[in-house]
Protein backbone atom coordinates (compact mmCIF):
# COMPACT_ATOMS: atom_id res chain seq x y z
CA UNK A 1 0.00 0.00 0.00
CA UNK A 2 1.20 3.51 -0.82
CA UNK A 3 -0.10 6.63 0.95
CA UNK A 4 0.43 10.17 -0.32
CA UNK A 5 0.39 12.77 2.47
CA UNK A 6 -0.61 16.18 1.07
CA UNK A 7 0.07 19.47 2.87
CA UNK A 8 -0.37 23.08 1.80
CA UNK A 9 2.42 24.48 3.99
CA UNK A 10 6.01 25.51 3.35
CA UNK A 11 6.86 25.47 7.07
CA UNK A 12 7.83 22.80 9.58
CA UNK A 13 5.69 23.11 12.68
CA UNK A 14 2.92 21.17 14.42
CA UNK A 15 0.98 19.53 11.58
CA UNK A 16 4.17 18.83 9.68
CA UNK A 17 5.64 17.07 12.72
CA UNK A 18 2.46 14.99 12.99
CA UNK A 19 2.77 13.85 9.38
CA UNK A 20 6.41 12.82 9.82
CA UNK A 21 5.49 10.97 12.98
CA UNK A 22 2.77 9.03 11.14
CA UNK A 23 5.13 8.19 8.28
CA UNK A 24 7.84 6.92 10.63
CA UNK A 25 5.39 4.88 12.72
CA UNK A 26 4.35 2.89 9.62
CA UNK A 27 7.86 2.50 8.23
CA UNK A 28 8.36 -1.04 6.94
CA UNK A 29 4.59 -1.63 6.81
CA UNK A 30 3.11 1.00 4.49
CA UNK A 31 4.99 3.11 1.96
CA UNK A 32 4.32 6.78 2.69
CA UNK A 33 5.52 9.97 1.02
CA UNK A 34 5.22 13.65 1.93
CA UNK A 35 4.01 16.18 -0.67
CA UNK A 36 3.83 19.97 -0.23
CA UNK A 37 4.84 23.21 -1.97
CA UNK A 38 8.64 23.33 -2.18
CA UNK A 39 10.42 24.52 0.97
CA UNK A 40 14.07 24.42 1.99
CA UNK A 41 13.15 24.02 5.67
CA UNK A 42 10.78 21.13 4.97
CA UNK A 43 13.36 19.53 2.68
CA UNK A 44 16.01 19.76 5.43
CA UNK A 45 13.80 18.41 8.21
CA UNK A 46 12.50 15.50 6.13
CA UNK A 47 15.99 14.56 4.95
CA UNK A 48 17.12 14.34 8.57
CA UNK A 49 14.29 11.88 9.24
CA UNK A 50 14.73 9.91 6.01
CA UNK A 51 11.21 10.81 4.85
CA UNK A 52 10.60 10.91 1.09
CA UNK A 53 9.74 14.45 -0.02
CA UNK A 54 7.79 15.30 -3.18
CA UNK A 55 7.91 19.08 -3.63
CA UNK A 56 5.42 20.95 -5.82
CA UNK A 57 5.94 24.38 -7.38
CA UNK A 58 2.74 25.44 -5.63
CA UNK A 59 -0.53 24.02 -4.41
CA UNK A 60 -2.54 23.74 -7.61
CA UNK A 61 -4.68 21.20 -9.41
CA UNK A 62 -2.10 20.73 -12.16
CA UNK A 63 0.80 20.18 -9.77
CA UNK A 64 -1.08 17.82 -7.47
CA UNK A 65 -2.42 15.81 -10.40
CA UNK A 66 1.14 15.51 -11.72
CA UNK A 67 2.31 14.06 -8.40
CA UNK A 68 -0.65 11.67 -8.25
CA UNK A 69 0.01 10.45 -11.81
CA UNK A 70 3.68 9.87 -11.06
CA UNK A 71 3.25 8.25 -7.65
CA UNK A 72 0.03 6.27 -8.21
CA UNK A 73 -0.93 6.20 -4.50
CA UNK A 74 -3.50 3.76 -3.14
CA UNK A 75 -4.76 6.40 -0.69
CA UNK A 76 -4.39 10.16 -0.16
CA UNK A 77 -4.13 11.56 3.38
CA UNK A 78 -4.74 15.32 3.15
CA UNK A 79 -3.86 17.60 6.05
CA UNK A 80 -6.03 20.63 6.87
CA UNK A 81 -8.74 22.22 4.76
CA UNK A 82 -6.94 23.71 1.78
CA UNK A 83 -4.97 20.52 1.10
CA UNK A 84 -8.22 18.59 1.55
CA UNK A 85 -9.99 20.76 -1.01
CA UNK A 86 -7.30 20.33 -3.67
CA UNK A 87 -6.97 16.62 -2.94
CA UNK A 88 -10.73 16.18 -3.40
CA UNK A 89 -10.49 17.91 -6.78
CA UNK A 90 -7.64 15.64 -7.88
CA UNK A 91 -8.11 12.24 -6.26
CA UNK A 92 -10.68 10.75 -8.64
CA UNK A 93 -11.42 7.23 -7.41
CA UNK A 94 -8.44 7.15 -5.03
CA UNK A 95 -9.69 6.97 -1.41
CA UNK A 96 -9.22 10.20 0.56
CA UNK A 97 -8.70 10.67 4.30
CA UNK A 98 -8.95 14.25 5.54
CA UNK A 99 -7.12 15.33 8.70
CA UNK A 100 -7.90 18.66 10.39
CA UNK A 101 -5.19 19.90 12.74
CA UNK A 102 -6.71 23.03 14.30
CA UNK A 103 -9.93 24.89 15.08
CA UNK A 104 -9.47 27.93 12.86
CA UNK A 105 -11.65 30.98 13.36
CA UNK A 106 -12.39 31.18 9.64
CA UNK A 107 -13.88 27.67 9.69
CA UNK A 108 -16.60 28.59 12.17
CA UNK A 109 -19.01 30.57 10.01
CA UNK A 110 -20.06 30.84 6.40
CA UNK A 111 -16.97 31.56 4.31
CA UNK A 112 -15.21 30.48 1.13
CA UNK A 113 -13.09 28.16 3.26
CA UNK A 114 -15.98 26.40 4.98
CA UNK A 115 -17.96 26.05 1.75
CA UNK A 116 -14.90 24.88 -0.17
CA UNK A 117 -14.16 22.21 2.42
CA UNK A 118 -17.60 20.68 1.80
CA UNK A 119 -16.11 19.11 -1.34
CA UNK A 120 -13.39 17.41 0.71
CA UNK A 121 -15.86 16.43 3.41
CA UNK A 122 -18.17 14.66 0.99
CA UNK A 123 -15.30 13.07 -0.95
CA UNK A 124 -13.40 11.77 2.10
CA UNK A 125 -13.95 8.24 3.35
CA UNK A 126 -13.07 9.47 6.84
CA UNK A 127 -12.27 12.77 8.57
CA UNK A 128 -9.92 13.02 11.55
CA UNK A 129 -10.21 16.06 13.84
CA UNK A 130 -7.44 16.99 16.27
CA UNK A 131 -9.88 17.92 19.04
CA UNK A 132 -13.59 17.85 19.78
CA UNK A 133 -13.62 21.63 19.49
CA UNK A 134 -12.15 21.49 15.98
CA UNK A 135 -15.03 19.23 14.91
CA UNK A 136 -17.69 21.24 16.72
CA UNK A 137 -16.23 24.49 15.40
CA UNK A 138 -16.58 23.64 11.72
CA UNK A 139 -19.71 25.31 10.39
CA UNK A 140 -21.07 22.20 8.63
CA UNK A 141 -19.75 19.52 10.98
CA UNK A 142 -23.13 17.82 11.42
CA UNK A 143 -23.08 16.77 7.78
CA UNK A 144 -20.01 14.63 8.42
CA UNK A 145 -20.66 13.28 11.91
CA UNK A 146 -20.92 9.65 10.78
CA UNK A 147 -17.55 9.68 9.04
CA UNK A 148 -15.69 11.76 11.64
CA UNK A 149 -13.60 10.90 14.69
CA UNK A 150 -11.43 12.86 17.11
CA UNK A 151 -7.75 11.89 17.20
CA UNK A 152 -5.65 13.85 19.67
CA UNK A 153 -1.99 14.36 18.81
CA UNK A 154 0.72 12.31 20.46
CA UNK A 155 4.50 12.55 20.38
CA UNK A 156 7.33 10.04 20.20
CA UNK A 157 8.71 10.31 23.73
CA UNK A 158 11.93 8.44 22.99
CA UNK A 159 12.66 10.74 20.06
CA UNK A 160 12.14 13.79 22.29
CA UNK A 161 14.66 12.59 24.85
CA UNK A 162 17.09 11.54 22.13
CA UNK A 163 16.91 15.07 20.70
CA UNK A 164 17.45 16.54 24.13
CA UNK A 165 20.59 14.44 24.55
CA UNK A 166 21.96 15.70 21.21
CA UNK A 167 22.22 19.26 22.55
CA UNK A 168 25.00 19.72 25.11
CA UNK A 169 24.27 23.41 25.73
CA UNK A 170 22.73 24.75 28.93
CA UNK A 171 20.09 27.46 28.59
CA UNK A 172 18.85 29.96 31.15
CA UNK A 173 15.51 31.14 29.80
CA UNK A 174 12.69 32.05 32.14
CA UNK A 175 10.15 31.45 29.41
CA UNK A 176 10.11 30.01 25.91
CA UNK A 177 7.71 30.31 23.00
CA UNK A 178 7.93 27.72 20.21
CA UNK A 179 5.79 28.14 17.12
CA UNK A 180 4.90 30.23 14.12
CA UNK A 181 4.55 33.99 14.45
CA UNK A 182 1.10 34.33 12.89
CA UNK A 183 -2.32 35.81 13.64
CA UNK A 184 -3.41 32.52 15.22
CA UNK A 185 -0.55 32.63 17.74
CA UNK A 186 -0.98 36.35 18.62
CA UNK A 187 2.70 37.31 19.03
CA UNK A 188 1.70 40.93 19.73
CA UNK A 189 -0.01 39.78 22.90
CA UNK A 190 3.10 37.83 23.80
CA UNK A 191 5.24 40.96 23.47
CA UNK A 192 2.87 42.95 25.71
CA UNK A 193 2.95 40.13 28.26
CA UNK A 194 6.76 40.19 28.24
CA UNK A 195 6.69 43.95 28.88
CA UNK A 196 4.36 43.39 31.83
CA UNK A 197 6.63 40.68 33.24
CA UNK A 198 9.68 42.93 32.92
CA UNK A 199 8.04 45.45 35.26
CA UNK A 200 8.25 42.85 38.05
CA UNK A 201 11.34 41.01 36.83
CA UNK A 202 13.81 43.38 35.11
CA UNK A 203 16.21 40.53 34.26
CA UNK A 204 13.51 38.57 32.39
CA UNK A 205 14.99 36.25 29.75
CA UNK A 206 12.67 35.00 26.99
CA UNK A 207 13.32 32.81 23.93
CA UNK A 208 11.14 33.10 20.82
CA UNK A 209 11.66 30.10 18.55
CA UNK A 210 10.00 30.31 15.15
CA UNK A 211 9.31 32.51 12.16
CA UNK A 212 6.23 33.74 10.36
CA UNK A 213 4.57 36.66 8.63
CA UNK A 214 4.31 38.64 11.88
CA UNK A 215 8.00 38.34 12.79
CA UNK A 216 8.94 41.89 11.83
CA UNK A 217 5.84 43.33 13.48
CA UNK A 218 6.64 41.43 16.69
CA UNK A 219 10.26 42.64 16.60
CA UNK A 220 9.15 46.24 16.07
CA UNK A 221 6.71 46.02 18.97
CA UNK A 222 9.44 44.44 21.09
CA UNK A 223 11.67 47.47 20.51
CA UNK A 224 8.88 49.99 21.10
CA UNK A 225 8.13 48.29 24.44
CA UNK A 226 11.86 48.45 25.30
CA UNK A 227 12.19 44.73 25.91
CA UNK A 228 14.71 43.94 23.16
CA UNK A 229 17.36 43.09 25.77
CA UNK A 230 14.99 40.58 27.38
CA UNK A 231 13.38 38.90 24.37
CA UNK A 232 15.54 36.88 21.99
CA UNK A 233 14.20 36.02 18.52
CA UNK A 234 16.03 32.81 17.62
CA UNK A 235 14.27 32.02 14.33
CA UNK A 236 13.59 28.47 13.20
CA UNK A 237 15.47 25.87 15.25
CA UNK A 238 15.61 22.28 14.02
CA UNK A 239 16.03 21.01 17.58
CA UNK A 240 14.75 23.34 20.34
CA UNK A 241 14.05 20.48 22.76
CA UNK A 242 16.91 21.22 25.21
CA UNK A 243 15.85 24.89 25.24
CA UNK A 244 12.35 23.82 26.24
CA UNK A 245 13.65 21.44 28.89
CA UNK A 246 15.89 24.10 30.46
CA UNK A 247 13.24 26.86 30.47
CA UNK A 248 11.19 27.55 33.58
CA UNK A 249 7.95 27.81 31.57
CA UNK A 250 6.46 27.54 28.10
CA UNK A 251 4.03 30.24 26.99
CA UNK A 252 1.17 30.05 24.46
CA UNK A 253 -0.97 33.10 23.69
CA UNK A 254 -2.93 31.54 20.83
CA UNK A 255 -6.36 32.63 19.66
CA UNK A 256 -7.08 29.00 18.78
CA UNK A 257 -5.23 25.67 18.85
CA UNK A 258 -5.63 22.01 18.08
CA UNK A 259 -3.45 19.84 20.30
CA UNK A 260 -0.12 21.71 20.17
CA UNK A 261 2.88 19.45 19.73
CA UNK A 262 5.07 21.96 21.57
CA UNK A 263 2.81 21.75 24.63
CA UNK A 264 2.97 17.94 24.61
CA UNK A 265 6.75 18.14 24.37
CA UNK A 266 6.91 20.56 27.30
CA UNK A 267 4.67 18.32 29.41
CA UNK A 268 6.86 15.29 28.66
CA UNK A 269 10.00 17.27 29.55
CA UNK A 270 8.60 18.69 32.79
CA UNK A 271 8.39 22.33 31.67
CA UNK A 272 5.18 23.96 32.98
CA UNK A 273 2.87 25.39 30.32
CA UNK A 274 0.96 28.65 30.70
CA UNK A 275 -1.62 29.23 27.98
CA UNK A 276 -4.75 30.96 26.89
CA UNK A 277 -7.71 28.54 27.30
CA UNK A 278 -7.84 27.78 23.59
CA UNK A 279 -9.59 24.69 22.33
CA UNK A 280 -7.25 21.69 22.67
CA UNK A 281 -5.30 23.27 25.54
CA UNK A 282 -8.34 22.86 27.77
CA UNK A 283 -8.08 19.11 27.19
CA UNK A 284 -4.40 19.05 28.17
CA UNK A 285 -4.12 21.27 31.24
CA UNK A 286 -5.97 21.60 34.53
CA UNK A 287 -5.63 25.19 35.67
CA UNK A 288 -3.38 25.51 38.70
CA UNK A 289 -2.68 21.77 38.81
CA UNK A 290 -0.78 20.75 35.67
CA UNK A 291 -0.23 24.24 34.26
CA UNK A 292 -2.19 27.47 33.92
CA UNK A 293 -5.05 28.50 31.64
CA UNK A 294 -6.26 32.09 31.61
CA UNK A 295 -7.59 34.69 29.21
CA UNK A 296 -6.51 37.53 31.50
CA UNK A 297 -3.03 38.94 30.89
CA UNK A 298 -2.60 40.16 34.47
CA UNK A 299 -3.43 36.71 35.81
CA UNK A 300 -1.10 35.14 33.26
CA UNK A 301 1.71 37.39 34.45
CA UNK A 302 1.06 36.45 38.08
CA UNK A 303 1.05 32.75 37.21
CA UNK A 304 4.33 33.03 35.34
CA UNK A 305 6.03 35.05 38.06
CA UNK A 306 5.06 32.39 40.59
CA UNK A 307 6.59 29.70 38.38
CA UNK A 308 9.78 31.73 37.91
CA UNK A 309 10.22 32.36 41.63
CA UNK A 310 9.17 29.06 43.22
CA UNK A 311 11.06 25.87 42.21
CA UNK A 312 8.81 23.70 44.39
CA UNK A 313 5.67 25.00 42.70
CA UNK A 314 7.35 24.50 39.33
CA UNK A 315 8.02 20.87 40.24
CA UNK A 316 4.43 20.39 41.42
CA UNK A 317 3.07 21.58 38.07
CA UNK A 318 5.65 19.58 36.12
CA UNK A 319 4.95 16.31 37.96
CA UNK A 320 1.20 16.65 37.41
CA UNK A 321 1.72 17.53 33.75
CA UNK A 322 3.93 14.47 33.25
CA UNK A 323 1.24 12.23 34.75
CA UNK A 324 -1.40 13.75 32.48
CA UNK A 325 0.88 13.35 29.48
CA UNK A 326 1.56 9.69 30.23
CA UNK A 327 -2.18 9.02 30.52
CA UNK A 328 -3.00 10.43 27.07
CA UNK A 329 0.11 9.72 24.97
CA UNK A 330 -0.80 6.28 23.61
CA UNK A 331 1.24 5.71 20.45
CA UNK A 332 -0.22 2.26 19.76
CA UNK A 333 -3.81 3.51 19.92
CA UNK A 334 -2.93 6.46 17.69
CA UNK A 335 -1.35 4.23 15.07
CA UNK A 336 -4.31 1.84 15.16
CA UNK A 337 -6.74 4.71 14.63
CA UNK A 338 -4.82 5.75 11.51
CA UNK A 339 -4.69 2.17 10.23
CA UNK A 340 -8.44 1.79 10.74
CA UNK A 341 -9.03 4.88 8.57
CA UNK A 342 -6.87 3.46 5.81
CA UNK A 343 -8.53 0.06 5.89
Per-segment meaning from a language model:
Residues 139, 150-172, 238, 242:
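Acidic anion/phosphate-binding donor-loop and adjacent secondary structure
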Residues 313-328, 337-339:
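A short, well-ordered alpha-helix in the C-terminal region of glycosyltransferases
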Residues 287-298, 306-311:
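Conserved acidic donor-binding segment of nucleotide-sugar-dependent glycosyltransferases
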Residues 13-24, 177-196, 213-220, 261-264, ...:
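A conserved mid-protein helix/loop that constitutes part of the nucleotide-sugar donor-binding site
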Residues 5-59:
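N-terminal strand-loop element at the rim of the active site
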Residues 236, 255:
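Aromatic "clamp/platform" in nucleotide-sugar-dependent glycosyltransferases that forms part
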Amino acid sequence: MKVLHVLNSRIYSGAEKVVCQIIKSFRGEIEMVYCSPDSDIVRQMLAEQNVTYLPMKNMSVSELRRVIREQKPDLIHAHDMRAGFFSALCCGKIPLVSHIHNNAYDARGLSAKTVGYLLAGFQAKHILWVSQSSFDGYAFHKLFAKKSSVLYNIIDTQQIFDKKAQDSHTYDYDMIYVGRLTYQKDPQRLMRLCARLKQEKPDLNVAIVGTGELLEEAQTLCESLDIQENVHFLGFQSNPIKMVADSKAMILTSRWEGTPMCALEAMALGTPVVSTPSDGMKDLLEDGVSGYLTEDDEQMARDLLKIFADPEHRKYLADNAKRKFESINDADAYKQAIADCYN
